[in-house]
From Swiss-Prot:
Region entry Disordered, spans: 1-42, 68-98, 413-490
Lineage per the UniProt record: Eukaryota, Metazoa, Chordata, Craniata, Vertebrata
Free-text note regarding domains: The N-terminal zinc fingers are involved in sequence-specific DNA binding. C-terminal zinc fingers mediate homodimerization.
Tree of life domain: Eukaryota
SUPFAM superfamilies: beta-beta-alpha zinc fingers
Taxonomic source organism: Mus musculus
Coiled-coil residue windows: none
Name of the protein this chain belongs to: Zinc finger protein Eos
UniProt-annotated stretches for the region Interaction with FOXP3: 281-586
Length: 586
């Protein structure tokens, strides 16, 4: 190794700095000093080598500099300097041992450098002592790149964690990963004290305190804190639609869906549903002379077709309840068709009406004759009864009423509505308006089939749903006095087989113009009032007992216990349940 005999500059040193390609200023100054002719054969060797390791620290200024105080740790001898930071005593020279310049090849340099130092830079980056680097594990993006926390360099250039073996793409990723082992969270929120391992997470957290939502939708007022949330929101605007989030809309009913496939499935069902409504309406309007039945659930827009889209279709998209998407929306419209007395095929006022207005038991105190059944039920549980078809009986009280002293014959065959929409409770019955009930059919129909009579218990529900009638208005006011007899109509021959012997002498009366009648008489031969439950096929001579019994039948299902809700299969099971009194309420 060649060492220059003397240098025109004085070097003082106590520290050791390795500069494998940086500190360009010190290197240039050294080359400038050596280019004075002292060692002409040294510079080519210096230029060809990759690294210089100097034993002394180059000093440019006189006095105690900051670098000398920080790194040398000892006072430096006096020196004379000029304003251009060059020494004025070139006669002073250093001995051969005062400065030592060593040159190594690439292989020797890589052997001398530790594995941690080789991880930082591949190009000629600065490698300084640990005292010059920033604190480990903190990076705010403003200073130089932090020192790598350590790892194993793989042949593909990636770093491997020496704790768990996780492979990271670079030193920064490895540094953040090592914080999961050390538990270090250098980024802290000044407002709530939350700490984070990365600065980006802290910045996103600060937006929670400020309420800032920097990502805004250009099409609507939607704003969010994260970019990925905005990206998902923008997909809703891919197809222009007034319904945000559901861009696929049905042309028939206006309902919107998120996916095209779901819309296609719905349109097929919705179109078939509307076609069925149209077919039913055409069949109904084509037979104006038939009996008035099956008239409900027909919207006005179907009765009066027009070229425009029906107005009721807009209501299909505004369903009030949740339902499966596979079920087409149901029309929600007028539940009752109202008719005046002139539209009915028979005269309601022919033989009188009620003695007084129909009223609920809740309006009166319970009499002792009612027994324990109604007392157990309570007046709050009393509802309008679902009475049997009146083809078999012409006089039935349509609601649970108070004890009548006299019962009036009802010439029209009436029944309470089968749904709650028709009005129930005292507020619907006592407001002064006409009472609405459904008519079964024409009284004067001479061709009534015997099957329209008292049906068996197994087909009670289906027959009730099949026979849907219109709505009639009952007159109010005191009607004339009734005749002393009660006429019970019969149509079913099977009923006569079940009861071959009439109770207390059932005398066959003269058949009327359109049906056979039975008259109940007592032992002395005088007529006796009788009340019949069509569901259980039981005759009651006392109206109070009949009312109590009818109160046990359910509103929607006649074989559902109105006390506890128990469902029976037939009238025998229902009667057994009522007799045993096994009611489990709640």
């Amino acid at each position: 190794m060649h060492t220059p005999p003397a240098l025109p500059r004085r070097f003082q040193g106590g520290g050791r700095v390795r500069t494998p390609g940086s500190h360009r200023q010190g290197k240039d100054n050294l080359e400038r000093e050596l280019s004075g002719g002292c060692a002409p054969d040294f510079l080519p060797q210096a230029q060809d080598s990759n690294h210089f390791i100097m034993e002394s620290l180059f000093c440019e200024s006189s006095g105690d500099s900051s670098l000398e105080k920080e790194f040398l740790g000892a006072p430096v001898g006096p020196s004379v300097s000029t304003p251009n930071s060059q020494h004025s005593s070139p006669s002073r020279s250093l001995s051969a041992n005062s400065i030592k310049v060593e040159m190594y090849s690439d292989e020797e340099s890589s052997r001398l450098l530790g594995p941690d130092e080789r991880l930082l830079d591949k190009d000629d980056s600065v490698i300084v002592e640990d005292s010059l680097s920033e604190p480990l594990g903190y990076c705010d993006g403003s200073g130089p790149e932090p020192h790598s926390p350590g790892g194993i360099r793989l042949p593909n250039g990636k770093l491997k964690c020496d704790v768990c073996g996780m492979v990271c793409i670079g030193p920064n990723v490895l540094m953040v990963h090592k914080r999961s082992h050390t538990g270090e969270r250098p980024f802290h929120c000044n407002q709530c004290g939350a700490s984070f391992t990365q600065k980006g997470n802290l910045l996103r957290h600060i937006k929670l305190h400020s309420g800032e939502k920097p990502f805004k939708c250009p099409f609507c007022n939607y704003a969010c804190r994260r970019r990925d949330a905005l990206t998902g929101h923008l997909r809703t605007h891919s197809v222009s639609s007034p319904t945000v989030g559901k861009p696929y809309k049905c042309n028939y009913c206006g309902r919107s869906y998120k996916q095209q496939s779901t819309l296609e499935e719905h349109k097929e069902r919705c179109h078939n549903y509307l076609q069925s409504l149209s077919t039913d309406a055409q069949a109904l309007t084509g037979q104006p002379g038939d009996e008035i039945r099956d008239l409900e659930m027909v919207p006005d827009s179907m009765l009066h077709p027009s070229t425009e889209r029906p107005t009721f279709i807009d209501r299909l998209a505004n369903s009030l309840t949740k339902r499966k998407r596979s079920t087409p929306q149901k029309f929600v419209g007028e539940k009752q068709m109202r008719f005046s007395l002139s539209d009915l095929p028979y005269d309601v006022n022919a033989s009188g009406g009620y003695e007084k207005d129909v009223e609920l038991v809740a309006h009166h105190g319970l009499e002792p004759g009612f027994g324990g059944s109604l007392a157990f039920v309570g007046t709050e549980h009393l509802r309008p009864l679902r009475l049997p078809p009146t083809n078999c009986i012409s006089e039935l009280t349509p609601v649970i009423s108070s004890v009548y002293t006299q019962m009036q014959p009802i010439p029209s065959r009436l029944e309470l509505p089968g749904s709650r929409e028709a009005g129930e409770g005292p507020e619907d019955l006592g407001d002064g308006g006409p009472l609405l009930y459904r008519a079964r059919g024409s009284l004067t129909d001479p061709g009534a089939s015997p099957s329209n009579g008292c049906q068996d218990s197994t087909d009670t529900e289906s027959n009730h749903e099949d026979r849907i009638g219109g709505v009639v208005s009952l007159p109010q006011g005191p009607p004339p006095q009734p005749p002393p007899t009660i006429v019970v109509g019969r149509h079913s021959p099977a009923y006569a087989k079940e009861d071959p012997k009439p109770q207390e002498g059932l005398l066959r009366g003269t058949p009327g113009p359109s049906k056979e009648v039975l008259r109940v008489v007592g032992e002395s031969g005088e007529p006796v009032k009788a009340f019949k439950c069509e569901h259980c096929r039981i005759l009651f001579l006392d109206h109070v007992m009949f009312t109590i019994h009818m109160g046990c039948h359910g509103f929607r299902d006649p074989f559902e216990c109105n006390i506890c809700g128990y469902h029976s299969q037939d009238r025998y099971e229902f009667s057994s349940h009522i007799v045993r009194g096994e009611h489990k309420v709640g």
